[in-house]
Regions:
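Short, conserved beta-strand edge motifs with alternating hydrophobic and charged residues
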Residues: 28-30, 65-68, 102
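Basic/aromatic recognition patch in beta-strand/loop cores that engages polyanionic ligands
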Residues: 45-57
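Acidic-basic catalytic patches of nuclease active cores, encompassing PD-(D/E)XK
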Residues: 1-45
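Charged phosphate-binding loop/patch that engages nucleotide di/tri-phosphates or the phosphate backbone
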Residues: 1, 132-164
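Short, electropositive alpha-helical surface patch
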Residues: 114-135
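Mg2+/Mn2+-dependent nuclease catalytic core
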Residues: 71-91
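Conserved catalytic cores of phosphodiester-cleaving nucleases, focusing on short active-site segments
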Residues: 54-56, 61-73
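Nucleic-acid nuclease catalytic cores
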Residues: 90-121
């Protein structure tokens, strides 16, 4: 569970805020205290419009996968995956604030994992059971019904386009 602590100060926060502004998202807060973390923390940013807040975590400026579930209160419950469960993706937090994004889309009531290369629809049952694996996702570019989502993302955040 996230523990509220004093906010990080310094160059990392400045770079995160710069990236957030670049992508048109609102920087909410960055905590320095998170269960299971050393020299790490949690970032919460907000995308205006129909997209809910998303949260991702970092350790020593590396973005890490987490286990998660969407709660009735509208919050994401996050917890670190063990090394054996981790999905093998890490990216510099500073270089791309949107590299891993967990999004609940109000339009279609679906969950998506976004990064700079592709968009994955997440299996809600797996989220509810807090067991997530790439095998439980669907490459969104293969689903015709998601064109509206792609257009929205490409127009607002330039995440789709030729990167898929």
């Amino acid at each position: 569970k996230a523990k509220k602590g004093k906010e990080f100060e310094g160059s990392l926060v400045s770079k995160i805020k710069t990236q957030a502004k670049k992508y048109g998202v609102q920087f909410v807060r960055l905590y320095d205290s998170f269960s299971g973390f050393t020299k790490g923390g949690m970032v919460q940013v907000r995308i205006p419009g129909q997209w809910s807040d998303f949260i991702f975590m970092f350790k020593e400026s590396k973005c890490c996968f987490v286990e998660f579930k969407y709660t009735e209160s509208g919050n994401f419950h996050l917890g670190m995956l063990s090394d054996s469960q981790r999905l093998g993706f890490e990216s510099s937090l500073v270089n791309d604030i949107l590299y891993f994004v967990l999004v609940f889309c109000d339009i279609e009531k679906k969950y998506y994992m976004l990064n700079s290369k592709r968009i994955l629809e997440l299996n809600p049952k797996k989220i509810a059971s807090r067991r997530f694996n790439l095998k439980d996702t669907f490459p969104a570019e293969s689903l015709e019904s998601h064109k509206e989502i792609f257009q929205f993302l490409n127009k607002n955040y330039n995440l789709v386009g030729n990167k898929l």
